[in-house]
């Protein structure tokens, strides 16, 4: 079911080549709408699916296939956070922003799992469960960095450990292709 987005994109491109990146993006958005809603209109669920899709692109692609970057909008924010963390700078603003982003991705995964097309969810629930666990891990790890700033060892270690447990859970799912 999830592959229908790519099939829709390819069919549209083959039938009438895109004239701009904006047109390609519009077609891609419409494909996500159709896969989730069975029609071409936006919905809360199709927007959630589209947002999750931006962060779940397969990076193990053969060399002859154009590489699609994963989490393009998020990567620079994570790099900036990491660099500030290494240099001991204040992370309050970046931490808050990342927590909001991760909370939204978690909410998107939960919404899609609860209200998405049943055939689609049956096939991708592993990715959705993985996403929820990964976002829980990231939330805990970000909270651990608060403990670093506060010089609160218990907060660091409790949240670091919680983050590792969530991460371990996230990699426990069997993905069937």
Predicted features by range, described:
Residues 1-177:
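Substrate-binding groove of N-acetylhexosamine-processing glycoside hydrolases
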């Amino acid at each position: 079911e999830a592959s229908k987005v790519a099939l829709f994109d390819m069919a549209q491109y083959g039938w009438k080549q895109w004239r701009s990146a904006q047109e390609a993006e519009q077609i891609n958005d419409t494909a996500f709408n159709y896969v989730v809603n069975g029609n071409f209109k936006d919905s809360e669920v199709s927007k959630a699916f589209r947002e999750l899709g931006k962060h779940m692109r397969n990076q193990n692609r053969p060399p002859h296939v154009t590489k699609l970057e994963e989490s393009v909008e998020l990567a620079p924010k994570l790099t900036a956070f990491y660099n500030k963390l290494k240099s001991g700078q204040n992370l309050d603003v970046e931490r808050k922003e990342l927590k909001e982003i991760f909370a939204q991705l978690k909410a998107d995964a939960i919404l899609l799992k609860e209200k998405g097309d049943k055939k689609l969810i049956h096939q991708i629930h592993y990715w959705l469960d993985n996403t929820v666990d990964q976002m829980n891990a990231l939330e805990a790890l970000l909270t651990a960095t608060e403990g670093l700033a506060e010089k609160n060892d218990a907060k660091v270690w409790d949240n670091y450990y919680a983050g590792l447990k969530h991460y371990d859970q996230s990699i426990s799912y069997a993905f069937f292709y």
